[in-house]
Amino acid sequence: MHTLKQSAIESVGRRQLLQAGGIGLLSGFGIADAAQSRSSLKSRIVCVGGGITEIICALGYESSLVGVDTTSRYPLSVRHLPSVGYARHLSLEGVLALAPQQVIVGHDAGPLAVLSRLREASVLVSRVEDGQTLDALISRVKQIGQLLKCVGQAQALIQKLNVEWDALRQTLAIPAHTIRVMFVLGQTPSQMLVAGTDTGADAMLKHAGLQNAFSGFRGYRPVTAEAIIAAQPDLVVLTQPDALTPKNGLNSRSVIDQFTGLSATPAARPSRWLVFDTMYLLSFGPRLPDAILTLRRASIEAMRA
């Protein structure tokens, strides 16, 4: 990968140090006061991680974002921001070109060498902890609230999430028949992977009170027609980038033809296919309670069709 010349990195670093130092000096002499608008205190942020971007926006700091990664698709307005590319393959030049003061990344962001060079350029790089539970989500909100110095907004968001989660638990307490789900992660029509255990998809199914029909392996992988027939899924949940949420009755031969074994399972009916936006189900951001509830209700409704 082509890298910036050291002089260019140092130039960006010096400029950002002057910006940060200027704010500190003004505050030290009492010029900055409580009447100063919040927007003027915000720093330039690059965010890497769709769920993290959603939290930042939910806290009211969308205007601070100057760049996002390819998984940051919500709210829709962030799609117009400059992209720094795929989270695991960040470009040093691409990030520095946006002159960020903070880069907030998820657990899988990298390469590590790029993050280290950003720190050398005096950019504050913070890695947000991972997790697919409500507690993990709340921890992320707290951490980001501290990074952005908006603890009050973070606490308000946490309170909202707790209220939504309590309502969700009441819904999940209503008994329902066991529904065996084949969860398909679809990136392109030619790249369809089925979710096993230790995946975000498996966590979502458990949250929604659904059963993963492919619990015999870990991660995401292709499966054979024989494996599908043996699993006997009742329902297929397919995630696609920017799909409508939710949509059932998928009518795509290019997708169905990849899973010929489905014709010998209860999931053969078109009404037993549910299509969701990938990041809606798998970002584990502030929309988590709503996504779980929608997945459960859509699954139960599809089984009645």
Each model region followed by its residue ranges:
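Short, Asp-centered acidic motifs that coordinate Mg2+ and/or phosphate
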Residues: 102, 234-235
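Extracytoplasmic substrate-binding proteins
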Residues: 39-44, 102, 113-190, 211-216, ...
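His/Asp/Glu-enriched short active-site or ligand-binding loop at hydrolase and phosphoryl-transfer sites
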Residues: 195-220, 240
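A short, structured surface patch at a secondary-structure boundary
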Residues: 44-113, 240, 244, 259-262
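A ligand-binding cleft/hinge motif common to bilobed small-molecule-binding domains
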Residues: 111-120, 237-256
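N-terminal secretory signal peptides
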Residues: 1-13, 23
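Short helices/loops that flank or line small-molecule/ion binding pockets
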Residues: 92-99, 224-232
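Boundary at the C-terminal end of the N-terminal hydrophobic targeting segment
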Residues: 32-37
